[in-house]
Structures are given as C-alpha cells and as structure tokens.
Swiss-Prot record:
Member of a network of 50S ribosomal subunit biogenesis factors which assembles along the 30S-50S interface, preventing incorrect 23S rRNA structures from forming. Promotes peptidyl transferase center (PTC) maturation. It comes from Salmonella typhimurium (strain LT2 / SGSC1412 / ATCC 700720). InterPro entries: DarP, DarP_sf. It is found in: Cytoplasm. It comes from the Bacteria. This is Dual-action ribosomal maturation protein DarP. One of its GO terms (biological process) is assembly of large subunit precursor of preribosome. The gene is darP. Keywords: Cytoplasm, Ribosome biogenesis, RNA-binding, rRNA-binding.
Amino acid sequence: MTKQPEDWLDDVPGDDIEDEDDEIIWVSKSEIKRDAEELKRLGAELVDLGKNALDKIPLDADLRDAIELAQRIKMEGRRRQLQLIGKMLRQRDVEPIRQALDKLKNRHNQQVVLFHKLEHLRDRLIVEGDDAVAEVLTLWPHADRQQLRSLIRNAKKEKEGNKPPKSARQIFQYLRELAENEG
C-alpha cells in the first residue's frame, strides 16, 4: 500500500497517538504468489468436481458459471480459465468453500474405509462361517441370520465351482444395507 502525500503528515514523530488499525502489514511478493497459486489449485479442484458435488459447495453465480465454463473448455483455454477462477477466488472469502470441499473429501474417505471393512467382513463370513455370523449379529442385531447363512453357503459353492461370485456380491450389498440403516 503506497502512501499519498497527504498521509505523510500523519507520520509526524511527535505524534503520540497510535492507531493500531492503520498499521501496515508487509507481505512479500513471493507469499502473494504462493497464495495466488494455492487459490488456483483450489479452483482446479472445484473444476474437477462433478455437478452434484458442486451443488453442495457455497458458490456465487459468477464463480459457478466460470467453473462450469472451465469444465467444458479444453487445453490452453482451460489454463486461462483456471487463472480467472483463481483471480475470482482472491476476491472472495474462500474459507466456506474450503470447508465444504474438505467435508466432501472426508465423506468419500470415510466411505472407502467403510467399504474396505465390509469387504473384509464378507471374506471372513465366507471363510469362517458361523463364528463370523455371530459377530455380524452382535454388530447388527436386526440382521437376518437365515438369509446371511444362505448367502454364505451359496458363496462357498460358487467359489468351489469357480463360478462368478454373485452371492459374495450379495453378501457385501446386504452388509452395506445393514451399515447404512444403522447410521
């Protein structure tokens, strides 16, 4: 921020009144460039999101239009559009956008972890049988023991006969339904 000639008089050394709001914070040019580059990366993440995910992020109309345009553009035009989005983000409060984006990423990561746990449980059900069924019933007391045993029996037969794992997929789907109904 450069000072105008009329502001020079405010810096008289004998002036004991200091206004803390007028304090100038010096920021290096490199830091400004790093911040701009970070906002450009945030803009690129927003462009890579799908329409449903974008609906969950608080964006104003101008920024949303710029993002949708960048999604349609290819090559060099896309790079220029990403720079424009970065510039638009510099003029806005990006904290709500970052929080919504982190929330989306976190939800996806939690879902992946849940799916891995359910796959592991499904494999244990097929290998161990009744011991693992008892564990499933302790996790989800409303689970149907008879249906689960039937699916496990069919999955074992399919595995022995080198058939496609249709029942194993059904076990996974059933476990996923139980987990979704719980939460």
